[in-house]
Amino acid sequence: MATIICKRNRFNVVYSYYDEAGKRHQKWEAFSTMPEAKQRKSEIEYKQQLGSFTIPTCNTLNELLKEYVSLYGKTKWAINGYSSNTGLIRHYIAPKLGELRLKEITPRVLEMFYQGLLKTPAVPLMTDKKYRQTGKFVQPPTIRKIHNLLHSAFKQAQKWELIEKNPAEFATLPKYEMKERNIWDSQTLFHAIDCCEDERLKLCLNLAFSCSLRIGELLGLTWDCVDISEESIATGKAHIVVNKQLQRVNKRSMEATDSKDVLTTFPEIGLQNNTVLILKKPKTRASIRKIFLPKTVAENLTKWKMEQDFLCEKRKINLPLVIRFPCYFPKSMVK
C-alpha cells in the first residue's frame, strides 16, 4: 500500500519495501501535482498486487533511462514521441554517456557531451535514401531535444531520490537560432490551385487553407464529421469537426505504448513493414474543434462525396474517409 503526504507544496507518495536481506525501508517519491501523485500511487498498488513492483535502483545512466522509459515514457509519451525519444537514447545518449554513474554526470560533462555531438555524424532519417551518405552532423535543434529528454529523466531521478540535483538544469546548450518557417501568401495559394489538375489535391488545398488543417487532420477527416447538407450550406452552417488524425507510426512503439489513443489500424501492404498507418485521437483536447466551411468549399465537398459514393458502390466498400488513398482500407471498412 502507498499513501500521499503533502509537504512544502509537494505531493509525496510514500510506501514501504523490503531489501534482499529482508530489512524494511520507506521510500518517498515527490510530485508537483496531486493528479501525478495519485497516478503513481495507483500504479504502485496495482503492481504490488500483481507481485511485479520493483524499486527504482539505478547506478548508471543506462539503468536510469531504462527505468525512466518503462515507468514514465510508456505512460506519458505518444507513439511517435516514444519512437523519437528512444531513438535519441539509442543513437546518441547511450553510446556516449550510458556507462557513466549518475554521480559522475555534472553540468560540465553534459556541456562537453553537447559540444561533441556537433562533430558527431547524424543518424540518417527514414526519408533518406538507403545507404545514402549525408555527411551531416548533429544539429543544435536535435541537441536541444536530447537536453530536454535528459532534463526530464534527471527530474524523475530526483523524485525517486536517486540524485540530489538535476545536472541538466545548469548545463549550457550550443547557440541555436530558430529559423522562420516560410508560408504561402494568398497569391501563391490561388496560383497553386489554378495550376492543380488533380481534383483530390485541389480539394485538399482548399480544405487545408480554409480550415487551417494539419496534414494528419486533413487525411484523417471522415464523413461522419462533415455537415454539408443543403440546409447547412444555405444557412452558412456547413462545418467539419476535427477529432482525429492520420499518422504513420512504428509498430514496436505502438505495442510498447499499448496502442494508446489509436482508433483504427490500417492493414499493412508488406509483411516486412516496420511501420503502420493509424487513425488516432488528437494530442490535446484543444486540437478538437468545429470549423465552419466557406460555401465554395462546402459545394466542392458535396461534389466529391457524390463521386466517392459512386466509387464505393462500384467496389463494394464502405469508405468513411473524406480523402481516400489507394490500398489503405481498414478491415472494418470493407463490406
Model-assigned labels for residue ranges:
Residues I93, L110, L150-A153, E161, ...:
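Conserved hydrophobic/aromatic pocket- or pore-lining residues that grip, position, or stack substrates
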Residues C6-F11, Y17-M112, D309-R324, F329:
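N-terminal DNA-binding module of tyrosine recombinases/phage integrases
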Residues V123-T127, Q133-P140, R144, K159, ...:
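Basic, Lys/Arg- and aromatic-enriched nucleic-acid-binding interface segment
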Residues K7, V14, Q187-T188, L221-M306, ...:
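Conserved tyrosine-mediated DNA breakage-rejoining catalytic core shared by Y-recombinases
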Residues L64, L88, V109, K145-L149, ...:
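Charged catalytic carboxylate motif
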Residues A122-V123, D194, D198, C211, ...:
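Short, basic (Lys/Arg/His-rich) helix/loop patches that form interaction surfaces
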